[in-house]
């Protein structure tokens, strides 16, 4: 199994334990900061500083942060730029623990309500995030399987960023368009041709997923 996984992608040059700890703590605090900011933006919309209120009014950042796409992109970046698949699992799990905990602690103790059904979805997603991160880390490998993984990840991201049917196609917001473009850049292959092929296959897969499972996460 180890040889099979190494054929997909090898671990990067090892880093010191101190560096690993610093990176993981930084990712934890990033999650805490983003979770707190997301809930603050949602709860204090009428009391935001004028500049932030104007930006939020144009881009609807509050609702954007309430959907899945941006968090999947951040987790993807943390995963594939981690030193190894195991480190990807740890870092992504720590990020979601920080983000989800800070968001719902703010919601419960400052905003004064606790949306149990949504919280359970995020708790469940956090629980499985190490496994997903482990798999996603291999998407930046050089093998055909890595190529397929990249296309599958982009297909899922596509369906989180766009809504479409027989006679319509819309982006959820301009920010989601940016998220998908960044996803393409992050998962790009060695050549433009391969990257274009990956993007095309991912869109075809997204349409197939939409037919088989016509349910989009946030």
Give the residues covered by each predicted segment.
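Hydrophobic core segments of alpha-helical transmembrane domains in multi-pass membrane transport
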Residues: 26-38, 156-160, 180-185, 202-207
